From Swiss-Prot:
Binds 3 Mg(2+) ions per subunit. It is found in: Cytoplasm. The keyword Nucleotide-binding applies. InterPro entries: Aa-tRNA-synt_II (IPR004364), aa-tRNA-synth_II (IPR006195), aa-tRNA-synth_II/BPL/LPL (IPR045864), Lys-tRNA-ligase_II (IPR002313), Lys-tRNA-ligase_II_N (IPR044136), Lys-tRNA-synth_II_C (IPR018149), NA-bd_OB-fold (IPR012340), NA-bd_OB_tRNA (IPR004365). This is Lysine--tRNA ligase. GO terms for molecular function: ATP binding; lysine-tRNA ligase activity; magnesium ion binding; tRNA binding. CDD domains: LysRS_core, LysRS_N. It is an enzyme of class 6 (ligase). Homodimer. Its main location: cytoplasm. It catalyses: tRNA(Lys) + L-lysine + ATP = L-lysyl-tRNA(Lys) + AMP + diphosphate. Belongs to the class-II aminoacyl-tRNA synthetase family.
Amino acid sequence: MIKKTDLNNNIFQKEKQIRKEKLINMKKNGFSFPNSFKKNTNSIKIHQEYENKTINELKVLNVEVTIAGRMIQRRIMGKASFFTLQDMEGKIQIYTREKEITSDFYNNHFKKWDIGDILGIEGILFKTKTGELSIFSKKLKILTKSLRPLPDKFHGLSNQEKRYRKRYLDLISNNQLFNIFKNRSKIIRFIRNFMIENNFLEVETPMLHNIPGGANARPFITYHNEINEEMYLRIAPELYLKQLIVGGFERIFELNRNFRNEGVSARHNPEFTMMEAYIAYSNYEDMMNFTENLLKNIIKSICGKSEIKYNKYYLNFNIPFKKLTMKESILQFNSNICLSDLKNLQKIKKIANNIGIEIKDNWNIGYIENEIFEKTVEKNLIQPTFITEYPVEVSPLARRNDFNSNVTDRFELFIAGYEIGNGFSELNDSEDQKNRFLNQMKIAEKEKNKDMLYDENYIEALKYGLPPTSGLGIGIDRLIMILTNQISIRDVILFPTLRSFKK
């Protein structure tokens, strides 16, 4: 018995061969892939300008158009045919007939073209008897021959792995996905424009670092042949950006890629887009206000409303974002824990063990508190919420709080259970920063972590004086997930990280 998959594969291979032979014959008859094709419009402009015109109005207007795109559907009805052309903006129906383009061209060329071929069209706008806006083609030209049948001809591109690996096919056949990435571009453009309009200067810092720094993450290691040294793809631009604040810039941002040699999940991709911003002479509360304003403006501009649906939740951006300290949030979502438990090492260890947290030897109260928060609280932070007062132990670059030296002037923004942003008042005491770096080195040595290195150049820069400064980092991919209602980060990254095809 022949399996359905084998049958489909046989049909696919046969069609590949037929298309290849068609191209060979086309080349024998003088076809060469054209160098260009001048369009004067696209599908969305046509629909926007002429959708409301009547049949008679279009006859009077006699609108000539030149358009190009991919043929994705076709109905041949003897001496006349309808087909659908898809371009970047949408779709438009094309009508052609033997009388207009000659019998020879219609029968020996057009009818032998395939779904997936890229065509250039010149024609006149009209409406069919059913009222569908269409183009009556006077000239047809094949621009590119498709040698592979499109996936929707064989029930779509349903395999998730293939969707990511052959993103171009997914984009051709999935209009919803195509629009997600158009919206991604709009969101990034809006953020960039918003920052510039708020007097931020966009800067660029190195992607290749001599020392990994700016975040506690495992780096990708590469090698520079000329200088004969290992280098690291950046895990964060933070330390370079703060050196620019030392140098005199007061409002800067960078919107670019970071790389972290860590796990892949619905919320994590090793290569991801971040925006980091810094404001001199401000503190973390100022940056929280700025972050809330930025997010509300993005939602209003991109979504056109202040309440949006994400997964099964309705997210309200119309009200002030909620604010909780880390301890307050743990108590709120853990009725069996009281405040005194979080201040006692033995009690907090017992709580952590009871919920399955594996405690490392060097962990003190701050580390354990953060682990309890991540395990029991984060997933419950659905509406936009700022969490503040992070322990010093997990915030090595943040300024200590004036009233409690065990916590920092730091916040993280959570939406729909995802960490979207991280910000704080920057630590500008060079001695305190040096001691924290050295403490990190001791811990890394015990854990045999060779990726944690001491950044002497950054400490040297701090000694020249970093003004009071607040910083912010926003995970752009996660934000886009929420704005486009996607549950996997892979569905908002055009080419997510995958194993090599052979593996």
